[in-house]
Amino acid sequence: MEGPRSDVGRWGRSPWQPTTPSPEPEPEPEPDRSSRSRRGGGRSFWARCCGCCSCGNRADDDWGPEPSGSRSRGTSSRGGGSRGGDSRGRDSRGGRRPESRGSGVNAAGDGTIREGMLVVNGVDLLCSRSDQNRREHHTDEFEYDELILRRGQPFHIILFLNREYESSDRIALELLIGNNPEVGKGTHVIIPVGKGGSGGWKAQVTKTNGHNLTLRVHTSPNAIIGKFQFTVRTRSEAGEFQLPFDPRNEIYILFNPWCPEDIVYVDHEDWRQEYVLNESGRIYYGTEAQIGERTWNYGQFDHGVLDACLYILDRRGMPYGGRGDPVSVSRVVSAMVNSLDDNGVLIGNWTGDYSRGTNPSAWVGSVEILLSYLRTGYSVPYGQCWVFAGVTTTVLRCLGLATRTVTNFNSAHDTDTSLTMDIYFDENMKPLEHLNHDSVWNFHVWNDCWMKRPDLPSGFDGWQVVDATPQETSSGIFCCGPCSVESIKNGLVYMKYDTPFIFAEVNSDKVYWQRQDDGSFKIVYVEEKAIGTLIVTKAINSNMREDITHIYKHPEGSEAERKAVEKAAAHGSKPNVYATRDSAEDVAMQVEAQDAVMGQDLTVSVVLTNRGSSRRTVKLHLYLCVTYYTGVSGPTFKETKKEVVLAPGASDTVAMPVAYKEYKPHLVDQGAMLLNVSGHVKESGQVLAKQHTFRLRTPDLSLTLLGAAVVGQECEVQIVFKNPLPITLTNVVFRLEGSGLQRPKVLNVGDIGGNETVTLRQTFVPVRPGPRQLIASLDSPQLSQVHGVIQVDVAPSSGGRGFSEAVGDSRSGENIPMAFRGGA
């Protein structure tokens, strides 16, 4: 695509122009996925435990593309055997794994096993979903068979030895990550059994049973996150032994919000359940007065998603030594979820033409997007703010950070760091479009993640804003955050990262400037409550909406809020902006829009009230246009002029009826319209100015479960949709997705006639028990933003198995006939 500022519908400075087809996304270089060659050495046991000389494959990227439909997984080895059956020889993403390296090695490196040596025949990492480790680490929902741990928390393993363990024997566990593991960088961890390791790493023997040895291993709360290779070394009087690396024994380590020593620690269990473990959520959109909500499948535990999240860090080239720092990790994620600069996950598109990809409104979750990126290495078309935010929530929750998706209504986009939203008019109050670069988005979606901020002074821990939507550059790249919400609330815009930009999004003033006869500009009106009018997120343990505006800003109009705004503006590019303000206002104006469904007629109204003691005459001008949710509007398609006389204390209403046939030819994404109102009070010279955005609602999909849902057993869902428009919807596409229920599925259903009702039935096989969300969407060139969701309570299988290896069909582009078609 062209540079980001060329996107119609996104950048306020871009002129309105007809939609043109998007060019094919540029192909990206295929990532290097080759395994590194093995290194060896013949030095002493402890010398060979350092990163520069221990042998073995040190690569963290020994994987290939996942074959379509592949679900193979590795398992722990026991005496060289496999519990994985058909997973042997493949890595966790379905790609070919390197073979195990045969017998263990002795000090000479020749593979000779001498009598009396302590040989490790195998290791059981107790890594199945029902085992103690996965349950205690809250990773049992991951659809992986490898051991997945949260740092700073102990786990247990069993070593299978060739003889009984003796007090003179020495055992060391090793964890290695990256291409050149080094002890000093934390990428090569040595854990001597029975001795305290460095940085919180240690291991103790908890049980001996013949030749079996049970160990309790403690990981560091500051450990690097990622996928580690695991091996064991022993030393006895007869010699030294190293267990060969087995890819089935790879260990994933994640951040741990359950660990008080981890800087991502969250001291509320209900928060952890919601912001770390919940696999679905609500994302809010629309306008403050007409809030829409959509369910999003985060799917952070789906098979392949964890590998996709780690691949994002690899693709950025993030140094392994920095991967233990949540500040650095979240900042990299904010850069990599968008494709600009670094060929990240999603290509942004605000043009309205999505013919070469997927309409951002059609996505129902993150899984399809992340697995496509992992499988191909290419950026996925297309995303807008809620898609970037939904994927970011998935990535950060998957890696162990408590994260939520946040919507800010009337979100400012400050392009000149003035920390005000500036709108310029000529002498007749006609907008000067060539100067109006700032814009106000109807809504904007970003993320909050919870962590301490050791890089900032005290008092700035807690929620941090991370925004992956590419709007402005930070340190030369398109990323944003993490930024302390506390610094935003108090106008401390000098705190890193990107506080000025985010402050302007939530608490800047909307300043109207009028050109004077001498060419200078004067402030004629200030809207102090127009920006960041409502900030919301999904409530904990509920599908209700939670208002979190108060954590971002002091009460609107309060002394503390005004001080925060003026303090922030003093650090902006127009520090004296408030010095020229005039105030003489006794006529109030309020805009109201009828709540209407797309396809219906509607009415918008302006209510004027004279709060003074004298008669007032108001000349009013209303003009209506369609608008993208980013605040970029099209040409006016209807306008009204009227003069209103108001007695003291009186009110009057100016109404503008709008028929479907009037707005239909002009509609763009989100079905939003913008009413611009400007006016002038003859007697006092007061200037009236208001921009009011409203949207047309779209219908929902109705989902019904036909029968009970049981793990491993096929069940059926019925989807019903009624076309609200009198025109035919062409090339209609349904999407289905639900963690533990249905892998991402795309269904092509053809055309749907005007006002027609259609019924679609689909089968799926649940793979995990418990309450689940099955989410669907409908998209066509004529109608988008149509969604539906149903909760599915999945029972365990009759055999008592909590999980199933069955996988919902993930076919894409399947042509599906309708089960039933009916009239209006």
Swiss-Prot record:
GO terms for molecular function: identical protein binding; metal ion binding; protein-glutamine gamma-glutamyltransferase activity. It is found in: Membrane. The modification Phosphoserine is found at residues 22, 70, 92, 100, 103, 812. Residues 1-10, 85-100 have a biased composition (Basic and acidic residues). The active site is at 385, 444, 467. PROSITE patterns: TRANSGLUTAMINASES (PS00547). It catalyses: L-glutaminyl-[protein] + L-lysyl-[protein] = [protein]-L-lysyl-N(6)-5-L-glutamyl-[protein] + NH4(+). InterPro entries: Ig-like_fold, Ig_E-set, Papain-like_cys_pep_sf, Transglutaminase, Transglutaminase-like, Transglutaminase-like_sf, Transglutaminase_animal, Transglutaminase_AS. Its main location: membrane. It holds the Pfam family Transglut_core. The modification Phosphothreonine is found at residue 20. GO terms for cellular component: adherens junction; membrane. Residues 65-76 have a biased composition (Low complexity). Palmitoylated. The membrane anchorage region possesses a cluster of five cysteines within which fatty acid(s) may become thioester-linked. It is subject to phorbol ester-stimulated phosphorylation and is hypersensitive to proteolysis, which releases the enzyme in a soluble form. Its EC number is 2.3.2.13. It is a lipid-anchor. Its cofactor is Ca(2+). Binds 1 Ca(2+) ion per subunit. Interacts with PLAAT4. Catalyzes the cross-linking of proteins and the conjugation of polyamines to proteins. Responsible for cross-linking epidermal proteins during formation of the stratum corneum. Involved in cell proliferation. PANTHER family: PROTEIN-GLUTAMINE GAMMA-GLUTAMYLTRANSFERASE (PTHR11590), PROTEIN-GLUTAMINE GAMMA-GLUTAMYLTRANSFERASE K (PTHR11590:SF49). This is Protein-glutamine gamma-glutamyltransferase K.
